[in-house]
Amino acid sequence: EIPLRLVGSEMCIRDRNYPNIESNDFYVDATAMYLITQPQNFDVIVTSNLFGDILSDEGAGLVGGLGLAPSGNIGDDHGLFEPVHGSAPDIAGKGIANPCSMILTIAMMLDYLKEYEISNKINKAVENVVSAGKTLTPDLGGNSTTSELTKSIVDEILEGDY
C-alpha cells in the first residue's frame, strides 16, 4: 500500500480504479505548507500542471535548488524524464550551469528502466561530489564550471567503489 497525496478532483476517479491505495485530498496552499513541515508524509502527488510546477519548485528548494532536482513524468506505458530547471538563458554560454539535475534525471530514467546498479552508482557519485564541496558551480556556492563539476562526477562514477 503506497500513501498517495492528491490535489484536486482527480482523487474521486482514482479511488474507483485503485481502492487499495491510501490517499488524501488537500488544497494546494496546505500541500505547500505540508511539503515544508512534513515532507516525509508524501510519496506521490497528483495534481494539475500549474500546481505541480509550483510544488516541484518548492520541493527543489528543500534539496538545494533547481540545479539538484531530477524530474520524471510517468504514465501507464511510458516515462518522460527532464531536469526540473528550465533553459536558463541568463547563464547560457557562461559555463556555469549546474549539471547535477540533468545527471540525476538520467539516473532516474535508468532506475525506471530497471538499470538499478548504474542508477545507484550515478546517484551516489553526485551525492559524494556535492557533499565533498570541492567542485561546485556558483549556484551551489562554488566557483567551478559546468565541465569541471561534470568531470568530477564522471570520475567518481568510474572510480567509486559502490
Task: Report each predicted region and the residues it spans.
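Short, flexible active-site loop motifs that bind/organize anionic cofactors or intermediates
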Residues: 1-2, 92, 139
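Alpha-helix boundary recognition
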Residues: 7, 36-40, 158
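N-terminal small/polar loop signature for handling phosphorylated ligands or for N-terminal nucleophile
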Residues: 14-18, 22-43
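Glycine-rich phosphate/nucleotide-binding loop
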Residues: 33-121, 125-134
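Glycine-rich phosphate/pyrophosphate-binding loop and the adjoining helix
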Residues: 116, 125-162
